[in-house]
């Protein structure tokens, strides 16, 4: 049997313990995992207007994800700027991102997320891969990046971050 390949992507805005749990799950199930961070200057500028924090900057997030990925010997990390791939309405167009993901992950056995609603897209974009949903109910780590950004107290946010 050949190597088992996995893929996990996100904005990691900010990187938190739920992301780490998903990455760790992928590393345990696969021989090699590719992690991709999607960045978009326009979206990020809007968020930074209301959350002027170093933890949300592109540079900070890249360092966080690189540090986590370096803990695993068979994991690589890439960045995709999806700003040029936006639709006319300015929204993300995952179908346009798929060929860029394929440049880094030409074959995958598993695609990891914590979002069941991503299943239809993953089935279409990566038909050879099984969608592994990690902690969808967020019982292990009851947190998301959106929830962290909504927290008013910095110490509350920091306890969830990596």
What are the language-model segments listed below?
Residues 1-162:
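Nucleotidyltransferase catalytic core that binds NTPs
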């Amino acid at each position: 049997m050949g190597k088992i390949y996995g893929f996990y992507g996100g904005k990691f805005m900010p990187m938190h313990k739920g992301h780490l749990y998903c990455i760790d799950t992928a590393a345990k199930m696969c021989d090699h995992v590719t992690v991709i961070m999607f960045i978009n200057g326009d979206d990020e500028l809007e968020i930074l207007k209301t959350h002027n924090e170093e933890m949300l900057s592109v540079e900070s997030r890249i360092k966080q994800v690189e540090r986590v990925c370096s803990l695993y010997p068979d994991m690589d990390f890439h960045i995709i700027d999806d700003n040029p791939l936006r639709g006319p309405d300015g929204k993300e167009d995952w179908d346009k991102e798929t060929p860029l993901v394929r440049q880094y992950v030409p074959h995958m056995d598993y695609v990891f997320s914590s979002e069941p609603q991503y299943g239809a897209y993953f089935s279409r974009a990566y038909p050879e891969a099984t969608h592994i949903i990690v902690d969808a109910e967020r019982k292990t780590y009851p947190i998301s990046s959106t929830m962290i950004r909504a927290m008013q107290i910095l110490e509350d946010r920091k306890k969830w971050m990596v």
